[in-house]
């Protein structure tokens, strides 16, 4: 649970922020900044949590090793995207509508394929860790919304920050879990959270789209 809680948001939050009529520019900026910082922060949180909770890290692996793997999984794609955006600004801007539509289609295809292909595992994951994943996800969404309400004046920013808090980078969490532990049980909360967050976030988007 600490692994998925420590994981930064992913690009999914950018797509859903667009669906929710939120502040997309803020969402992209937050994703980029947090992804860069996560290389240092996530290993620190996970290693300290494992030590505090008395969980044995079964593999001989260092924080530096994990940080380097995270750099290639999270940071490199962000840097690459920023470089492409700066070099091809006019082209990207002219194709914004097409890119947005493709993002919608790809998101829906991934969402549906996960449920169709992994249905047997989904039942197992939800049974074992669904409740804690749901509580964590909803807590982060509401905390993000009301913290943003206190600090910002715009509803678009509140939508954005709620989704940034509620949506985690499941791929990164799986990478960290598989690198540190040999037992698949440590991946169950991550898998359950990924399934829960997609579902709750879609409902959240449908609700907040009506709020202006």
Q: Where are the predicted features?
A:
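Alpha-helical transmembrane segments of multi-pass small-molecule/ion transporters
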Residues: 1-212
């Amino acid at each position: 649970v600490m692994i998925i809680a420590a994981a930064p948001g992913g690009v999914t939050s950018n797509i859903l922020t667009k669906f929710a009529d939120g502040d997309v520019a803020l969402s992209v900026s937050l994703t980029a900044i947090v992804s860069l910082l996560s290389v240092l922060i996530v290993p620190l949180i996970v290693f300290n949590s494992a030590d505090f909770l008395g969980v044995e890290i079964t593999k001989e692996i260092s924080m530096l090793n994990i940080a380097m793997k995270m750099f290639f999984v999270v940071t490199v794609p962000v840097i690459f995207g920023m470089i492409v955006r700066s070099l091809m600004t006019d082209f990207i801007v002219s194709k914004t509508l097409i890119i947005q539509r493709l993002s919608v289609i790809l998101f829906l295809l991934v969402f549906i394929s996960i449920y169709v292909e992994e249905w047997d595992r989904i039942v197992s994951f939800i049974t074992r860790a669904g409740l804690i994943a749901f509580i964590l996800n909803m807590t982060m969404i509401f905390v993000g919304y009301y913290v943003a309400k206190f600090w910002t004046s715009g509803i678009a920013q509140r939508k954005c920050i709620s989704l940034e808090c509620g949506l985690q980078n499941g791929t990164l969490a799986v990478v960290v879990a598989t690198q540190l532990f040999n037992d698949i049980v440590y991946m169950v909360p991550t898998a359950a959270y990924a399934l829960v967050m997609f579902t709750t976030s879609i409902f959240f988007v449908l609700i907040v789209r009506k709020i202006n």
